[in-house]
From Swiss-Prot:
Belongs to the metallo-dependent hydrolases superfamily. MTA/SAH deaminase family. This is 5'-deoxyadenosine deaminase. Homotetramer. Zn(2+) binds at residues 57, 59, 198, 286. It catalyses: 5'-deoxyadenosine + H2O + H(+) = 5'-deoxyinosine + NH4(+); S-adenosyl-L-homocysteine + H2O + H(+) = S-inosyl-L-homocysteine + NH4(+); S-methyl-5'-thioadenosine + H2O + H(+) = S-methyl-5'-thioinosine + NH4(+); adenosine + H2O + H(+) = inosine + NH4(+). Pathway: Amino-acid biosynthesis; S-adenosyl-L-methionine biosynthesis. PANTHER family: AMIDOHYDROLASE-RELATED DOMAIN-CONTAINING PROTEIN (PTHR43794:SF11), AMINOHYDROLASE SSNA-RELATED (PTHR43794). Catalyzes the deamination of three SAM-derived enzymatic products, namely 5'-deoxyadenosine, S-adenosyl-L-homocysteine, and 5'-methylthioadenosine, to produce the inosine analogs. Can also deaminate adenosine. The preferred substrate for this enzyme is 5'-deoxyadenosine, but all these substrates are efficiently deaminated. Likely functions in a S-adenosyl-L-methionine (SAM) recycling pathway from S-adenosyl-L-homocysteine (SAH) produced from SAM-dependent methylation reactions. Keywords: Hydrolase, Metal-binding, Zinc. Gene3D superfamilies: Metal-dependent hydrolases, Urease, subunit C, domain 1. It comes from Methanothrix thermoacetophila (strain DSM 6194 / JCM 14653 / NBRC 101360 / PT). Its cofactor is Zn(2+). Its EC number is 3.5.4.41, 3.5.4.31, 3.5.4.4, 3.5.4.28.
Length: 413
């Protein structure tokens, strides 16, 4: 496949008339006047080629619950609405929700997502069918102790797949015992996979934990020896200065989800301070049930402007830093060999620059973070075109099936 005459961003500058040659699932060459290797040629004039974006924390099947429970705080939202409905979920519902979520990710140029949920075999199969990458972990709760027995078989089944990266997903310190957390850590270390956990998301959660344990959730995990560079900790909203130092010292990756945190009134994560201390911060949307979309570009803008306002300095978290959160920082967190360069995985999106929000052509990174509206034109993952000129094959069928599943779930209330 040859992508011809695209524009790319290199060291902050816009380079035009660049060809990108793809062989198999890798980029084999980036340059000018490249010769095609087959009949597949994409005319990318007036298009910006960007590397595949990463959604670093979500619950993709919960796209099926978009708009079901709004305007509530986290714990009542979970206990009164989400968990009762989730108890009625069937594997087919999760499959439909995942495929619906994948449609949305593909439209926004996302080629990899990090997920924690139920029915992970169905999630993995649906993700693979849709053609994108998933870092997938079955959620672990003490209220469902049998779930941990599924972790190793899932890892063994999927660890050699080229799109699926199995991981271990203890839900949070308030839903997992010390034994569960240590078992999760042991499994992750033995199989060399990532750990995905919610951490210090709400003030009530942290205050309750401190009152019970006389230490913060971060200090507790540190005392257990749980924290390391394999951990991706979602949210990290309520942190002490000591917590931040611990996360930095242990090279923990943080998945920042600003819109969900704002909508659930959970708070504003100290992202600028985390970055100043050297913490690798990525970007996620959380689930569409609490966001309510999977628009990673919207997430970038909100992440930037909220930090500027909360810190009181407009220079905090500039556009290029936010862009890295959705790309390079996530590649590091999930060990992804991605980027628009020779030898990288062929994951990229083509975005039409002939749109009002990209004119005048000044800083394209600024436009992507602060101005971007709409969707990509092409999304390519692992060398396969998933969306061509705004069209995704089979989209109508996926939408109809998701609607049917939702209506059945609601009818059983």
């Amino acid at each position: 496949m040859l992508i011809r005459s695209a524009s790319i961003i290199r060291n902050g500058s816009l380079l035009k008339n660049i060809d990108i040659l793809i062989e198999g699932n890798r980029i084999s060459e980036v340059g000018r006047d490249l010769r095609p290797n087959d009949d597949e040629i994409i005319d990318a004039r007036n298009m910006l080629a960007v590397p595949g974006l990463v959604n670093s924390h979500t619950h993709l099947a919960m796209t099926l619950l978009r708009g079901y429970a709004d305007d509530m705080e986290l714990i009542p939202w979970l206990q009164e609405k989400i968990w009762p409905l989730e108890a009625r979920l069937k594997p087919s519902d999760v499959r439909a929700g995942v495929k619906l979520g994948c449609l949305e990710l593909i439209r926004f140029g996302v080629t990899c997502y990090n997920d924690m949920y139920y029915f992970m075999d169905e999630t993995a199969a649906a993700t693979r069918e849709m053609g994108i990458r998933g870092v997938l972990s079955g959620v672990l709760f003490d209220m469902r102790p049998e779930f941990i027995n599924d972790v190793e078989p899932f890892i063994k089944k999927w660890r050699d797949d080229d799109l699926i990266k199995p991981a271990v997903g203890p839900h949070a310190v308030y839903t997992c015992s010390e034994e569960t957390l240590l078992r999760a850590k042991d499994i992750a270390e033995r199989y060399d996979v990532k750990i995905h956990i919610h951490l210090s998301e709400t003030r009530d959660e942290v205050d309750t934990f401190v009152n019970q344990r006389h230490m913060s959730p971060v200090e507790y995990l540190e005392n257990l020896g749980f924290l390391s560079e394999r951990v991706v900790a979602a949210h990290c909203v309520w942190l002490t200065p000591r917590d931040i130092r611990i996360l930095a010292e242990r090279h923990v990756n943080v998945a920042h989800c600003p819109i969900s945190n704002l909508k659930l009134a959970s708070g504003i994560a100290p992202v600028a301070t985390l970055i100043e201390h050297g913490v690798n911060v990525c970007l996620g949307t959380d689930g569409a049930s609490s966001n309510n979309n999977l628009d990673i570009f919207e997430e970038m803008k909100v992440a930037a402007v909220v930090q500027k306002c909360s810190v009181g300095r407009s220079a905090i978290l500039p556009a290029d830093a936010v862009w890295r959160m959705a790309t390079e920082n996530a590649y590091k967190a999930f060990s992804l060999d991605m980027g628009i360069r020779r030898g990288a995985l062929a994951d990229l999106a083509l975005i039409n620059m002939r749109r009002p929000w990209f004119i005048p052509v000044t800083s394209m990174i600024s436009h992507l973070v602060y101005s971007m509206s709409g969707e990509a034109s092409y999304t390519i993952c692992n060398g396969r075109v998933l969306m061509r000129d705004g069209v995704i094959e089979g989209e109508a069928k996926i939408l109809d099936e998701a609607q049917r599943c939702y209506e059945r779930l609601i009818s059983e209330e």
